[in-house]
């Protein structure tokens, strides 16, 4: 997905900031990451409250390889229909935003 695609998807619901990371893009709303895009796939933030909903739909978590191990992050694939249908995207976005809001903010590193 291009940055334009991400803006088109998210901006009708909330102002977003995009930042490059993991060879992909992170999507921020109100200073919190709500999604990551890697290799054209969008993964939405989950937590213990929202993860079961994603699992019920058979959606897969974001994984990557590090030091010979498979690492799993708390982001799940977005359903295919949500890419093209704003009405289908809205509830999934809401779940991701709520999960991000419940997560503690990362502490800022002290400047030297």
Task: Walk through the language-model features, giving the residues of each.
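Charge-dense, helix-prone N-terminal extensions
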Residues: 1-112
């Amino acid at each position: 997905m291009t940055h334009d695609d991400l803006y088109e998807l998210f901006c009708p619901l909330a102002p977003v900031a995009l930042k490059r990371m993991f060879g992909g893009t992170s999507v921020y709303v109100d200073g919190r990451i709500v999604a990551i895009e890697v290799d054209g796939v969008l993964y939405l933030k989950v937590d213990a409250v929202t993860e079961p909903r994603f699992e019920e739909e058979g959606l897969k978590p974001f994984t990557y390889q590090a030091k010979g191990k498979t690492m799993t992050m708390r982001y799940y694939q977005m359903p295919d229909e949500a890419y093209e249908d704003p009405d289908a995207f809205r509830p999934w976005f809401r779940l991701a935003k709520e999960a991000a809001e419940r997560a503690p903010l990362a502490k800022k590193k002290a400047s030297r």
